[in-house]
Regions:
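NAD(P)+-binding Rossmann beta1-loop-alpha1 motif at the extreme N-terminus of oxidoreductases
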Residues: 1-55
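Phosphate-coordination loops involved in phosphoryl transfer and adenosine-cofactor binding
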Residues: 2-4, 87, 128
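Short phosphate-binding/catalytic loops that engage adenosine nucleotides
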Residues: 26-27, 107, 153, 193
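Rossmann-like NAD(P)(H) cofactor-binding subdomain of soluble oxidoreductases
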Residues: 36, 44-123
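Internal alpha-helical scaffold of NAD(P)-dependent oxidoreductase catalytic cores
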Residues: 38-45, 123-168, 173-210, 254, ...
Length: 262
């Protein structure tokens, strides 16, 4: 059973996940971050010690949970292996990292991917967050599954391809949509209008999706009406904002292509 966990990282995912694991009864026996101050801040909230040195981490952890940027995962695992040996168990939290890369450093590795957007100061209802896991052995897969079920009511074992597909879809559904909100906000601010005016619209669109509507079935707007007059007027109004104009034009073409493909 996974009881002693070392958190590698101190960002949004490491913070939220570390706190949830701590609340669930896991013993967090150390926090590592490349920035000592950040390691100490997170460690204090988890009643453990923080460090920026791998040599100061405990070597008897049941799990080294790696929540760092993708480009740093391999380096971190290589250093953990050098410090504690080939037999440690480590799992990363990435949606797209190729787990097989870790096989050259450690015997057993896994994935603990939470499909949610995290910020340190916003505490989500973790029971509703989908958690996707995988591991290089059935034993560790079961261990991660048991750990995940203490946090979430939606735990699934998936393969690497499925995880990457989920990550791509999540980027579209969350990251890209949020960027579009940012674009909308900037356009409004430049014209002395408040972004809050769009909140009822955003809530209604979100409500329909949450309640089970097919996104394609509730699509509205000038693109699917083929209202070329309005589209051209909008594009002209965005002449002084070429980047936003490009986004508008590209998304409009995508909408029309998808809606009228049949």
């Amino acid at each position: 059973m996974i009881k002693k966990i070392t958190i590698i990282g101190s960002g949004n995912v490491a913070t939220i996940l570390g706190k949830e694991l701590f609340r669930s009864g896991c013993s967090i026996n150390g926090v590592w971050s490349r920035t000592l101050k950040n390691a100490m801040i997170l460690a204090e909230s988890l009643q453990t010690s923080g460090t920026d040195k791998f040599s100061e981490l405990p070597g008897d952890s049941d799990l080294y949970l790696i929540a760092v940027i993708d480009d740093a995962i391999e380096t971190v695992v290589a250093q953990l292996s050098q410090q504690f040996g080939y037999r440690i168990f480590a799992a990363h939290t990435s949606g797209s990292f190729r787990t097989e890369v870790l096989g050259q450093y450690i015997q057993n590795s896994g994935v603990f991917y939470c499909l949610q957007t995290f910020t340190k100061n916003s505490v989500p209802d973790f029971r509703n967050i989908p958690v996707f896991i995988s591991a290089t052995s059935t034993f560790y897969e079961n261990e991660l599954q048991n750990m995940a079920q203490n946090l979430s009511d939606c735990v699934k074992v998936i393969d690497e391809h499925q995880r990457k597909v989920l990550h791509i879809a999540a980027v579209f559904a969350n990251n890209f949509v949020n960027h579009i909100y940012t674009v909308s906000q900037e356009i409004l601010l430049q014209n002395n209008l408040d972004f809050k005016l769009l909140i009822p619209l955003i809530k209604e669109s979100s409500r329909k999706i949450i309640e089970g509507s097919n996104p394609a079935d509730i699509q509205t707007g000038p693109a699917i009406r083929r209202d070329s007059t309005i589209i051209e007027e909008h594009l002209k109004m965005l002449d002084d904002l070429p980047h936003f104009r490009e986004i508008y034009n590209s998304v409009t073409k995508s909408l029309m292509s998808h809606h009228f493909k049949n």
